[in-house]
Amino acid sequence: MPLSSPTRRLVIVVRADPVICGHSGEARNLAEVAITRGFDDVRIVTWPIPTLQAAGLPLKPLDAVLPYSDGITVERPDPVGDYKVPDARFYGGIVGRLVELFTDGVPTVAMSLYLTPHATAVADAVAVARASGLPTDVTTIAEAVGSDITNVVRTSVEEQLFGAAAQVFTTYLGQDHCVAVSQFTKDLIVESAEAIDARHGTAFAAMCRARVDISYPAIDSRQFTDLDRSRLDAVLARRGLRDDGYVLFLSRVTKAKGVDDLIDGYAASHARERVPLVIAGTGPEAPALRARAAASSCADRIVFFDDVDDDEKTFLMAGSTAYVLASKPRPEFVETFGIALVEKMLAGGGPVITTATGGIPEAVGDHALIVPVADPMSIAQALDDAIMRTSPAERAQRAAAAREFAMQFDRINVFDRLFARVDPTTAAA
């Protein structure tokens, strides 16, 4: 093998940038740490951008996606063939590329974020690679990020689709290492498996209980803690904002994020008289929520930003008087961790106001103002408490404690804990 050939490879299969999703950021963060931990070839294998657009996923502006470090390659395999089954064609492209990466002689760790379809793609590629007779040295990690269970498996349980649920569990448990993004997610996995077992006499729950570990999402703390404060005022001024001068929502604009409750709660608060509300993000509910805001009693105090890049996001979080994510369970989505909440706590500024939905308590600990789900009046009270009744010294003390708690989710800490189990030869620099 030529000296220039890689010696250790990490492959991450995920919906990557420009998708607005915490797990696209997690993939980036794991990749960046891997380059410092002895992996000299890191591949993020994902979907072509037109496919992401066609799926209706919220996407960042392409020119706003930050570059990756040397040694990290983003691959977007083209579809295979021209028959009229688009999903199969693109899936075939991804599986085919993974087979090539698994059979070129480089020892590889392959990690999938989302079981459906990414863990399935990895499993299919490993089976093909080994059947080829070519040397194959692959260790697999499957990460259940939440919607795998809250959407796919739960639907299978509720609609008695045994085969679909069995496929997800079998694929998941067939990986070398199984992890979930929170204890809440693992509990959901076990609960769903128990429902399948009770109905069909299978034994998925016991295997999930024994084999699934917790690996929290990896977050680049430096992006939020090493903020250039000299730029803060200038960045905010371009948006017509000032430091400590607005309430912020920054996430995907969907029903499950509780933006409707935030708009109503803000309109009912006294804090509206002191600071405006900024809703930053894109998503399918944006038009309806813009209309809701326009019809509210404080329409002139609510602004929407749909073009925030990763760099500006940090400043918006740091400069906010309060950050609100009023998540609520929906059939299509439950907040299984709360990456944006951790990012806000790392950035500093005013307090986080959120709900105890899903895995959010694991993300925030005792460092957030918790309000009931779907309760705008409680949001109004929390905003008034945080903005009108808390001294600057109190807020600074709370912000420091929140940042200290959030550091456990730093990407280096998460990567090292995960790979201590997966690949003990990986040593911290």
Language-model features: locations:
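N-terminal subdomain of nucleotide-sugar transferases
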Residues: M1-D63
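Nucleotide-activated donor-binding/catalytic signature segment of Leloir-type glycosyltransferases, i.e.
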Residues: V126, D244, P287-E312, A322
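Donor nucleotide-sugar binding/catalytic pocket of nucleotide-sugar-dependent glycosyltransferases
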Residues: T139-A142, A166-R231
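Conserved donor-binding/catalytic core segment of Leloir-type glycosyltransferases
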Residues: V179, I214, I219-S221, L241-A267, ...
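A charged, aromatic-enriched C-terminal amphipathic alpha-helix characteristic of glycosyltransferases
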Residues: Q223, K257, A393-D423, A429
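Acidic donor-binding loop of glycosyltransferase active sites
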Residues: A318-F333, G350
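Short hydrophobic beta-strand element within catalytic cores of glycosyltransferases
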Residues: L346-T354
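Conserved acidic donor-binding segment of nucleotide-sugar-dependent glycosyltransferases
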Residues: T354, D366-M377, D385-S391
